[in-house]
């Protein structure tokens, strides 16, 4: 079924429903019905939320994705140069010959990226303080947000594990990539993996008092929205912080262990697994082939799904 025929079918169905309503109303009118049918059981919508809650909810929907975007782009600039850039320039091997332990080098590079992410969060939280709390700039008449200094501190605390998680993944990505261009190719899928769960707060009916608090990144997105409307469920706020914090700790440990391998710090395309071959290559290639099979399955299901 082509797009043209699908659109034609939709428009025809709408016209048939409209015609049926007109015929039904004409029968009522012909039989002497005293009022117009559309005036029976009318429903009116009334917004009971305050202007502060409306403004906070609207700002809370966009705050997490916006800060995440800035953290990813800002941290990526430093991460790509931390390992991929040094590989390309040939300076990483020189750094590894110093007396500094490899774990210390990885930790220092990770802290550098974390510093960029924290700086992004702090600057934007200060912007909220200046514009919303101190009232330096007059807001539009229909837009109001009521935040206290404690709310801003709570927002900053919620963003801390997200910053560590992003920094760890970006540094790990830089370790896998051998050049700037290869890093840029890998960056876009990672960007989507972080962006999609951060939009959980935009889903209708999504409440922090559910299993979403245990989902990393998504729990932070919903928790930030709750704080912006000044609804504090401390237990679930702690769960959202802890779930993302646990993911950040795991990612940091994984980055430190992974970047200790010779294959990721050298420009050589071969390591022991490449030389041995066979089952030794399975852990490295299984995800790649699984991804290819998943893409093929998705394409086939989209193409032939209606006929199966």
Regions found by a protein language model. Name each.
Residues 68-90, 110, 175:
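A hydrophobic alpha-helix feature that marks transmembrane segments and, especially
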Residues 150, 177-214, 218:
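Transmembrane helix segments
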Residues 82-115:
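Helix-loop-helix units of permease transmembrane domains in multi-pass membrane transporters
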Residues 82, 88, 146-192:
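A structural motif at transmembrane helix-loop-helix junctions in multipass membrane proteins
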Residues 82-84, 171-181, 246-292, 297-307:
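Junction motif at the cytosolic side of a transmembrane helix
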Residues 107-136, 161-166, 170:
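Hydrophobic alpha-helical transmembrane segments that constitute the membrane-spanning cores
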Residues 1-70, 74:
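Transport-system extracytoplasmic interface segments
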Residues 53-54, 128-155, 230:
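Membrane-interfacial helix-loop-helix connectors in multipass membrane proteins
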